[in-house]
């Protein structure tokens, strides 16, 4: 009996140790070097009534040209698209970005990891962040994409695709319709990202404002920094430098920190992280 009890305790301790090491590894695994990173992170796929990704085409064209992606292969991640098929999502993105002159292939068309490994760039679409991260982990793409981007493979994300470029997905606006393995994401930009930021409360709304929701996160994670992107705002990342892009100079990037006033970062300004 004693031997069985010792064996059970030993196995339990070993399992606990493995879980502890696994958790630690998950946090450390995506902290790759940042010097070679090239990324364009859009708050959303649209701006007012300009159409799907139309407002971002000038930024995207410049990004493609600067990174010599014309005629190159782009791995598209469609996993956030819940209300449409992956085929339909791929077709929508191909049509919207036809003028870029890149070859877009969705990772659902084959073995996802192989498509990402052979791609010259990675584009991640918007939708539901929980399902996006859920599928990224199921297909073993989180660490792989983080590593490829650290090696200089250009990355473009919009909405959920921008949220997951941050340290974790915990400042998403989405419903938890799926349970991912972890909230840790690509950590390309080693802070929190909140896309689609809207200030205040609509008339008649008695729930929390976006500011209040983000404050809740900071209360529990006081060392974190959140960058909130209003509609029409984007982050252009080159190594450890960030340029703020935007459609409206009156709607700047916002920086939120624990027990500090919200600070505004002007459109067209640059900062190091």
Give the role of each language-model region.
Residues 123-126, 149-168:
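Catalytic nucleophile loop
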């Amino acid at each position: 009996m004693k031997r069985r009890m010792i064996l059970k305790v030993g196995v339990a301790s070993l399992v606990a140790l493995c879980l502890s090491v696994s958790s630690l590894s998950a946090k450390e695994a995506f902290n790759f070097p940042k010097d070679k990173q090239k990324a364009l992170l859009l708050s959303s796929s649209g701006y007012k009534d300009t159409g799907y990704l139309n407002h971002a085409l000038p930024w995207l064209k410049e990004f493609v040209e600067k990174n010599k992606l014309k005629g190159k292969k782009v791995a598209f991640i469609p996993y956030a698209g819940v209300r449409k098929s992956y085929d339909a999502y791929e077709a929508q993105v191909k049509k919207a970005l036809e003028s870029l002159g890149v070859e877009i292939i969705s990772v659902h068309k084959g073995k996802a990891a192989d498509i990402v490994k052979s791609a010259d760039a990675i584009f991640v679409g918007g939708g539901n962040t929980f399902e996006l991260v859920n599928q990224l982990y199921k297909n073993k793409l989180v660490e792989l994409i983080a590593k490829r981007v650290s090696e200089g493979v250009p990355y473009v994300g919009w909405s959920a695709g921008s949220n997951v470029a941050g340290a974790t997905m915990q400042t998403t606006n989405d419903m938890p319709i799926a349970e991912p393995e972890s909230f840790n994401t690509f950590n390309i930009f080693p802070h929190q990202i909140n896309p689609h930021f809207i200030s205040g409360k609509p008339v008649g709304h008695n729930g929390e404002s976006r500011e209040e929701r983000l404050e809740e996160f900071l209360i529990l994670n006081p060392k974190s920094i959140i960058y909130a992107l209003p509609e029409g705002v984007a982050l252009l990342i080159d190594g450890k430098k960030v340029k703020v892009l935007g459609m409206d100079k009156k709607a700047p990037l916002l920086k939120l920190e624990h027990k500090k006033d919200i600070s505004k970062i002007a459109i067209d300004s640059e900062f190091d992280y």
